[in-house]
Curated annotation (Swiss-Prot):
Protein name stated in the entry: Protein-methionine-sulfoxide reductase catalytic subunit MsrP
Keywords: Metal-binding, Molybdenum, Oxidoreductase, Periplasm, Signal
Organism of this sequence: Escherichia coli O157:H7
Presence of the UniProt keyword Phosphoprotein in the record: no
Signal sequence segment: 1-44
List of residues binding Mo-molybdopterin: 88, 91-92, 146, 181, 233, 238, 249-251
Catalytic activity: L-methionyl-[protein] + a quinone + H2O = L-methionyl-(S)-S-oxide-[protein] + a quinol; L-methionyl-[protein] + a quinone + H2O = L-methionyl-(R)-S-oxide-[protein] + a quinol
Annotated gene: msrP
Length: 334
């Protein structure tokens, strides 16, 4: 596996920027929740920036045992841990970037059940402990690119999705993989109230082609910065597909179903002209309301330190994944 060396070490987000409270968020540009009604829920260039010297330490999540394969320990710069978990899109807990960190503590992640079903020979059910013990865990430093034209670099911990799917033995009828987030409106205020949850239809659903799901880069993620995922980052298990926009990274997964037909996906249902099924990072295909040619990398500095950088095709992973889309019109199949 080739390394992706497209960022300097000085650009990595520092761990001290990762876990932030609402009172520590400084908004350079603001927008009210009412203004975020669909289909305008994603707004480019509206970034919140974290400021202050009294930031709390990272949450005391469970320390994980994991390896650091050389192939994934590249020289990409890391986004600070407090920014990774303090600046999130997780509409089940509110629309503001700080809402998930403020509100996701209500999510109960243990016990947990993840079911693998559909076009498989051996359906599986995993519990909370299986997620961190059934498969060897490894740390992977990946770029993360939001459709809103900002980006991070994050040291995720998890296991390749293909290892889980192989245990279930997909049948010859399996062509797609459908994912579903937990539906728990008593714990997730955005599922209870359309205003809080951005008007989306819940539970949140996502999907991949089977070959995308089986790709070695596709990661079932259970940790970050050496510890179990905090709730605002999608505990206890989420999906990371580093060559796609962040909304493909479904959080708090309870169901994986292999299907014959392409499954529905939440943002494509909400605004099909703006959010495609594939959602591959592509600087040549703009969002209808903003350019995707460049992005703002979130590092350890404040708003005056933010640098724009060119967006890379497939988020810098073209050598690994471009062959998946040979012959496919990426403008039409965005």
């Amino acid at each position: 596996m080739k390394k992706n060396q497209f960022l300097k070490e000085s650009d990595v987000t520092a761990e001290s920027v990762f876990f932030m409270k609402r009172r520590q968020v400084l908004k350079a540009l603001g927008i009210s929740a009412a203004a975020l009604s669909l289909p305008h829920a994603a707004h480019a260039d509206l970034l919140s920036w974290f400021k202050g010297n009294d930031r709390p330490p990272a949450p005391a999540g469970k320390a994980l045992e994991f390896s650091k394969p050389a192939a994934w320990q590249n020289n990409l710069p890391l986004t600070p841990a407090d920014k990774v978990s303090g600046y999130n899109n997780f509409y089940e807990f509110g629309l503001d970037k700080a809402d998930p960190a403020a509100n996701a503590g209500s999510l109960k992640t243990d016990p947990w059940t993840l079911k693998i079903s559909g076009e498989v020979a051996k359906p599986l059910t995993l519990d909370h402990d299986d997620l961190t013990r059934r498969f060897p865990l490894e740390e992977r430093i990946y770029r993360m690119r939001c459709v809103e034209a900002w980006s991070m670099v994050v040291p995720w911990i998890g296991f390749p999705l293909h290892k889980l799917l192989a245990l279930a033995e997909p049948t010859s009828n399996a062509k797609y993989v459908a994912f579903e987030t937990i539906y728990a409106p008593e714990q997730m205020p955005g599922q209870q109230d359309r205003f809080i949850g951005g008007g989306l239809k819940y539970p949140y659903v996502e999907g991949l082609r089977l070959d995308e799901a089986m790709h070695p880069l596709t990661l079932m993620t259970v940790g970050v910065y050496g510890k179990a995922l905090p709730p605002q980052n999608g505990a206890p298990v989420r999906l990371i597909v580093p060559w796609k926009y962040g909304f493909k990274g479904i959080k708090s997964i309870v169901s994986i179903k292999l299907t014959r037909e392409r499954p529905p996906t939440t943002w494509n249902l909400a605004a099909p002209d703006e959010y495609g099924f594939y959602a591959n990072v592509n600087p040549h295909v703009d969002h209808p309301r903003w350019s995707q040619a460049t992005e703002r990398f979130i590092g350890s500095g404040g708003i005056l330190d933010v640098q724009r950088q060119p967006t890379l095709l497939f988020n810098g992973y073209a050598d690994q994944v471009a062959s998946l889309y040979r012959g496919l019109d990426l403008r039409e199949n965005f």
